[in-house]
């Protein structure tokens, strides 16, 4: 029986300042570091042992993974970083203060941008200096693949090939896996794993630094789900 642990990165500096982050590479806040270390202790206390680890190419998720693995004495396990586990790209909203954006466009519109399954945010042009096209961590990607903005539907479509090619085969082989990623890439995975509807996924919250443990049978049917609370 394989186990999968999903953990959203600890609080980031832009979580703290209430800014849209997306693909911007923001570090953990002091609280975020504490959350990640505490999550590692929870993992250790629960006796969870992993065979493989996956994370995004963004610092806040990578550091969270490393803190969790270090605290649980598993820093040595194989680790893969991929852009496919990145946070949802928030387009032209990235860097904006959420409260100020709501005051400008209205609470309802911002809620739709943040939580709707299939509504895109205002897009960021590839010519913009903040475009990920200019970031060397994506240099090997076709520029046409690099997004200028995503909704949860597009995020799921981005995540799924990696799930099917890299993660699911390991779980089917009975291996235990940990994924440290982001609120929306993990919401996308949870939607698929739990078969959550397009409407209900809007209400799913992923708390920072909280490990979520799934137990699967040999066909990847979910047998149980548990949150290792703070």
Swiss-Prot record:
It comes from the Bacteria. The keyword Amino-acid biosynthesis does not apply. One of its GO terms (molecular function) is phosphoglycerate mutase activity. Pfam families: His_Phos_1 (PF00300). GO terms for biological process: gluconeogenesis; glycolytic process. Keywords: Gluconeogenesis, Glycolysis, Isomerase. Substrate binds at residues 8-15, 21-22, 60, 87-90, 98, 114-115, 183-184. The record marks 182 as: Transition state stabilizer. It is an enzyme of class 5 (isomerase). It catalyses: (2R)-2-phosphoglycerate = (2R)-3-phosphoglycerate. InterPro entries: His_Pase_superF_clade-1, His_PPase_superfam, PG/BPGM_mutase_AS, Phosphogly_mut1. HAMAP family: PGAM_GpmA. Catalyzes the interconversion of 2-phosphoglycerate and 3-phosphoglycerate. This is 2,3-bisphosphoglycerate-dependent phosphoglycerate mutase 2. It comes from Lactiplantibacillus plantarum (strain ATCC BAA-793 / NCIMB 8826 / WCFS1).
